[in-house]
From Swiss-Prot:
Family: Belongs to the ERG28 family.
Keyword Membrane found: yes
Its membrane topology: Multi-pass membrane protein
Locations listed in the record: Endoplasmic reticulum membrane; Cell projection, Dendrite
Main localization, broad class: endoplasmic reticulum
Membrane-crossing residue ranges in chain numbering: 7-25, 40-60, 69-89, 96-116
Descriptive protein name: Probable ergosterol biosynthetic protein 28 homolog
Keyword Coiled coil in record: no
Effect of inactivating the gene: Hypersensitive to the acetylcholinesterase inhibitor aldicarb. In a slo-1 (ky399gf) gain of function mutant, restores normal locomotory speed and sensitivity to aldicarb.
Alphabetical UniProt keywords: Cell projection, Endoplasmic reticulum, Membrane, Transmembrane, Transmembrane helix
Function comment: Promotes the translocation of slo-1 potassium ion channels from the endoplasmic reticulum to its final destination at the plasma membrane, probably by shielding from premature proteasomal degradation in the endoplasmic reticulum. Maintains the levels of slo-1 potassium ion channel at the presynaptic neurons.
Expression across tissues: Expressed in tissues including muscles, intestine and neurons.
Any one GO cellular component localisation term in the record: dendrite
Gene coding for it: erg-28
Length: 162
């Protein structure tokens, strides 16, 4: 399950990079905005870029619960932001770019929540807990090992030599 969700994250990262590129490219900057002001596109690119960076961090540190929560919250906020820009403020046009962005963010939230609530995530977390170590070998510097008995033949040979 982890491998599939990581693969999904890499697909969504590529999509987010494309959305950020569209916000900064001159020929396509007004393709999803009703106004042709480049400031609107750049303002929309910031949460997309932050979400893209967070997803890249999540791919490399996939077992971090707090990054998962931050990713889920930022995905929800980005989807809500895009929907309010389209339907409430009507500053963005309803098109393939905005629909894809909202759909992929919403689906990412569902996929990540499914992964976080799955037993495979919980089993890996339980396996990483610290447990008491068993003694596998006795150290020679402990206890009576520093003072050998006098009847030992190595001790007697040392005394004769000295």
């Amino acid at each position: 399950m982890e491998r599939s969700t990581r693969a999904w994250m890499s697909i969504v990262v590529v999509q987010a990079m494309g959305s950020v590129w569209m916000c900064y490219a001159k020929q396509n900057s007004a393709s999803h905005y009703t106004s042709t002001l480049p400031a609107l596109s750049r303002a929309h690119a910031l949460p997309l870029a932050l979400l893209c960076i967070l997803r890249i961090v999540l791919i490399f540190d996939f077992r971090n619960f707090s990054i998962h929560i931050a990713h889920i919250l930022l995905s929800i906020l980005t989807a809500i932001h895009t929907m309010t820009e389209v339907f409430f403020y009507q500053s963005m046009s309803y098109g393939i770019v905005t629909v894809t962005e909202v759909t992929l963010n919403s689906f990412s939230v569902v996929v990540m929540l499914t992964f976080l609530l799955s037993p495979s995530f919980k089993n890996e977390q339980e396996g990483k807990e610290k447990r008491a170590r068993k003694v596998t070998a006795k150290h020679y510097m402990e206890g009576e090992m520093l003072t050998p008995e006098d009847d030992d033949e190595l001790v007697q040979a040392y005394k004769k030599w000295k």
